[in-house]
Amino acid sequence: MTRERHRCPKSNTTGAAGNQAPAEGRAKGRKAREMAITEDRVGSADLANGGSTTMKVRKRNGDLEPVDVNKIVRAVERCADGLAGVDPMRVATRTISGLCDGATTEELDELSIRTSAAFIVEEPNYSRLAARLLATVIDKEVRNQDIHSFSQSVAMGVDEGLIGSDVAEFVATNARKLNDTIEADRDHLFEFFGLRTVYDRYLLRHPEDRKVVETPQYFFLRVACGLSASPEEAIRFYRLISSLEYLPSSPTLFNSGTSHPQMSSCYLLDSPEDSLDGIYKRYADIAKLSKFAGGIGVAWHRIRSKGSLIRGTNGLSNGIVPWLKTLDSSVAAVNQGGRRKGAACVYLESWHSDIEDFLDLRENTGDPQRRTHNLNLANWVPDLFMERVEKDWQWSLFDPAKVPHLTDLYGPAFEAAYLKAEEEGNYERQVPARELYSRMMRSLAQTGNGWMTFKDASNLKCNQTGTEGRVVHLSNLCTEILEVTDQDETAVCNLGSVNLGTLVTDGAFNFERLAEVVRLAVPFLDRVIDINYYPTHEASKSNSAWRPVGMGLMGLQDVFFKLGLPFDSPEAREISARISEEIYFNALWASTELAQAAGSPHDNYALTRASKGDLQFDLWGVEPSDPSRWDGLKARIAEHGLRNSLLIAIAPTATIASIAGCCECIEPQVSNLFKRETLSGEFLQINRYLVRELQQRGLWNEAMANRVKMAEGSIQEVEDMPEDLKEVYRTAWEIPMRSLIDMAADRGAYIDQSQSLNLFMESPTIGKLSSMYLHAWKAGVKTTYYLRSRPATRINKTTIGGPIGGGESVEKPSFTDAEAVSCSLENPEACEACD
């Protein structure tokens, strides 16, 4: 039965311990507490007024009315129905105590929400209570604009220029069916911070008064309608995303169904040609792409290095830094649809002779004209460089004006061309490979930037590079997208992620439902390609010909919590690999169905490795779990082809994971204690899975909560914490990075693009980082993302002598950076410099 109007259900009040009281006792207790609160607040003389007080609130129409204490209590109780451990009276008491005479009803609503959120640190179900209270506020805000159905919300959006004409016509034609689809109770699936994120950032707002014109469920259905050709499709997709089992990426959520349907997440641009026209065209392209919420990756390999002769003027080049400084300012100036700052990552090949200046761009000291604090940086590293690091050989640095062909080569062809250029003496200078590698490690340790991405693995294991001349020149802003680019093609990708945490039922992971979710989602990812607004011709051309998409995942840590598995256990590693295999298999199957329905594969199918029978695991040399099943799929691919050249990419999912109420992508949790920030304030939250475990064992109380808070996120030293829980609830700082890398490599055989692989090191040293990234390269990982550290001080203490702070001094290091690299490579299991 459809429920358009959002109301919290009738209350079955629960006590602080979560036990349901008998109805009679509940009523008596409630009456007594109401009287106590009212008496304390306004005096016993007001009790005769039935809980009304001399304090007044201002209604939305401007009228003043007395505060009705009992009305506040009942409103909270309705929203607390079925929430064990939640005390509505406590919330009401705190709300009333913070109320000021003459406050507006909006302020009263916001105060009750903030009050509920403040208790989340003690009992996770207060998050659901705060979310339900917020949902009622959103509902009132929408209805006060005379919007009472989904179709009316869309009509309002059309009047204000927010909704696209095609979607407006689609909704008007199918209004009754679509209105009946709304399931308002699905708002109860949200945790508070997820719904707050939706309210603050995603719901469409009136352009003048900034009131929201859609509820969360209208929002989901609007997104679905923007990607659907029939009401049946829209209903199917609405039910999928409103269940939070799957969510499209932020650009799709922002823009689907709107007058500017730019729904792609990522744009990858080849290096500009080495000319003024080429560079300034690239600036313009990036600004256009960034304007509508696209994240940017751009290569800078072709731009000549510092000191290079400019024949047209007989002058010398200043190198890449001034150009990147201009790009830095441009990126910061472009606001992505008013929702977030523009963002870009610049990639540079390790043989470029400006590489050392490039690595300094994010430093906090030095000439500000040679620093770019808005750009992210990534190293595009060939295997030959890593091999020379291992062998402790020299590395030659080149001016791309002299060796322009190196940018478009990889694997054996690159190595041959590099060696030839080296033999001919075309290099600008030579440096010890380990010295340059240590500078890369230092950049990572000090800034978290200068990500290590591996050129040869990215090309040799990419489906799009099945024909000579097709080259991957870079990854994207978050290092999970790997697609070919050239001057005429800007690579594009549309993303979405399965919420794995919703797929654990009765103590087991539901692989059957995973398959269903993936097969439902892929057609809608593909649909974005045809509907999308493309800011540049090069982006439209590339996306239409290759039709790549990026199906990802989030909530892997939630799966392990629900199954009681340590993140790095053999069982967790096996489940992680199987999940990736199932997603890849079912995404490919769905793509063959799309090709069959369309009557043809994507335009460039003949250029791919899949057209020759090679899938991702073949390129890794890995045998899947059930080869006969894969043989059947390969036969389907041979018959129908694939509608999409690429299908799998694991994005960071920071924002949509917050909406879904799960942990980000493939990452372990970084803490058991979180500080959540919203537009209405900051709130503490303790890992809800940990709290539930402790409650079930009778160990959760105020003292335990305080011990967990005092431990600042780690529970390893918390008194009375069971040892098995310490294993399961370790943080990213307490899990060996070798395990994280090995799990990434396991799933990599089923990821035809890449994965945003953050690595964590509490106190990074050159030696530790050297060993870690060498292991990632040897494991076949294509890309890595941020290095996360806390605090970023150990690197300074181990490499810099002299006074620190208030005159203290530290012992001079026993190892130089180069010695630390050498030690870590030659003694990987027992490196003194890594201690």
Spans of features found by a protein language model:
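Conserved oxyanion/phosphate-binding beta-strand-loop segments in alpha/beta enzyme cores
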Residues: 181-197, 201, 228-259, 287, ...
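Internal maturation/activation junctions in enzymes
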Residues: 517-540, 548, 566-653, 709, ...
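Terminal amphipathic helices with adjacent charged low-complexity linkers/tails
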Residues: 127-158, 381, 458-486, 549, ...
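Core nucleic-acid recognition elements
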Residues: 26-53, 86-221, 238
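Function-dense linear segments that define catalytic or interfacial modules
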Residues: 204, 218, 223-312, 316, ...
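Acidic, low-complexity intrinsically disordered tails
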Residues: 8, 24-49, 794-835
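Catalytic alpha/beta core of large soluble enzyme barrels
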Residues: 169-197, 479-484, 525-530, 623-627, ...
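Polar, glycine-rich mid-to-C-terminal structural blocks
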Residues: 360, 375-440, 444-447
